[in-house]
């Protein structure tokens, strides 16, 4: 693409426009700045609300993929890539899943999580190499994330994923984006211009984080990774999480702390298993077998 076409393309992006409400940003006090930011941020959940039907459909696609042994893969550059990596990294400790089930890929690799990597978002071939490195396949779902909706790295990844038969999703903060035209589904989060012109780590980034929260949390809930509203598959890998698992057992069963701690130990720190052992008065192996017969869903097992 020649320089003039690029200039014209960028000029049309909502995320690159100046915000009329922040033209005097450099003259504001600290309180005025944070008040304006807070007011602008209040628009974000309202924008997300308009995209809930699309988000729900994507959740159902993710659940179906998980049940077939597929993975959820996030692909992005800069802030968008970091948010994908963040959401993916939270799934194992929160839901007890392996690190391969949800993956975050950022343009420029691991270094780009902490430092900007020059030219990474424009490297189209790198996206293909990165997806081939994790052996992306037709069972997987690829979610491309970019506020602009036109990041070359992400567009290239979406095209490659479609070629091999993966279901593809685009998350962008500009309407009718180039990414949306490629992907099977699009989630548009049109939050408008940022108070600091072009700084899409602000409202656009917040919108992306909210959407990613929904995609993984709702998917894991539908897979049976919670009971009532407790994260019963939490990996009790430190003191805080052991205490959380203990409290979850107490709240779900009504038992005393000593009983919860004892059963959690017997269940090898598996809160879901401990709850079932207490509520149905089972030994560990019987509880394991019963859960297995009910797709590892505690609610279904108890009902």
Swiss-Prot record:
Domain SIS: 62-225
GO molecular function: carbohydrate derivative binding; carbon-oxygen lyase activity; ether hydrolase activity
EC number of this enzyme: 4.2.1.126
InterPro entries per record: Etherase_MurQ, Glucokinase_regulatory_CS, MURQ/GCKR, SIS_dom, SIS_dom_sf
Keyword rRNA-binding: no
UniProt keywords, alphabetically: Carbohydrate metabolism, Lyase
One Gene Ontology term from the biological process aspect of the record: N-acetylmuramic acid catabolic process
Active site, UniProt feature: 90, 121
Catalytic activity: N-acetyl-D-muramate 6-phosphate + H2O = N-acetyl-D-glucosamine 6-phosphate + (R)-lactate
Pathway the protein contributes to: Amino-sugar metabolism; 1,6-anhydro-N-acetylmuramate degradation; Amino-sugar metabolism; N-acetylmuramate degradation; Cell wall biogenesis; peptidoglycan recycling
Keyword S-adenosyl-L-methionine belongs to the record: no
Quaternary data: Homodimer.
Family statement drawn from the similarity comment of this UniProt entry: Belongs to the GCKR-like family. MurNAc-6-P etherase subfamily.
Functional description taken from the UniProt entry: Specifically catalyzes the cleavage of the D-lactyl ether substituent of MurNAc 6-phosphate, producing GlcNAc 6-phosphate and D-lactate. Together with AnmK, is also required for the utilization of anhydro-N-acetylmuramic acid (anhMurNAc) either imported from the medium or derived from its own cell wall murein, and thus plays a role in cell wall recycling.
Note: A lyase-type mechanism (elimination/hydration) is suggested for the cleavage of the lactyl ether bond of MurNAc 6-phosphate, with the formation of an alpha,beta-unsaturated aldehyde intermediate with (E)-stereochemistry, followed by the syn addition of water to give product.
Protein name: N-acetylmuramic acid 6-phosphate etherase
Taxonomic source organism: Histophilus somni (strain 129Pt) (Haemophilus somnus)
Gene: murQ
